[in-house]
Amino acid sequence: MFAAVLRDAWRQYRRRPLAAVITVVVGGLPVFLEPDDPVVAVPLAVLLLGAGLLVELFLVAWLAGALDPAPPSAAAALATMRGAIGPGVRAGLLRALYLLLALLVGLLLFGSREGGPLPESEQTKLAVGLWPLFGVAFAFLAVLMQRVVLGGERKVRQAAGASHRVASAHFPICLLIGLLQASGLVMASLVVEFWLLAALSILLALADPYLIGMSNALYLRTRAEQEPVDTGDGSLKPPRR
């Protein structure tokens, strides 16, 4: 499964090279935008978050289409994205909630017991401690957006349940995806030189379509495992693995 997911992700990345350009523009270049005025910074952050979510929904559909014998056009992927905006926003909020819970656990485990801003050494310690926690949070939602966009699921709780079942069955792959996704959040917490931060941001943006491709491949190869099984007495249980 692991080799197949990596292979399918590379096929998507190779056949949709413009996806990397899109993610660099939306997710990499904004690191050079550092407005000092909060009146500008807050709306800009909200705008970038919204744009990032829309781009993710679009790329899920567009990259997955590259695996089809007759790949659909970008216009078809845009239409799929528009139909998934509502549940996609709810899925994004659910993911933010998972990350918030991971952050709270991290602060309890690695945060300073004293008030005031953390010294540089404590910030590094907290960032390193948060990385696996964020990675696990992302891992359990590794195919959440795929369930919404590719599976047409409109109930986010059901999409999350399906993603949990995939993570339980294929946790090493999901954890790898989650740790790579979490690296961007951790990197932003580290105190590093700006040029290094900018280079890493662009590198992660270039890798983002490949991570989406991994989640797409995992979702498409595990669709039979995502539905609970009817036991015959009216109750449901997780599918056999």
List PLM regions with ranges.
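Hydrophobic alpha-helical membrane segments
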Residues: 1-241
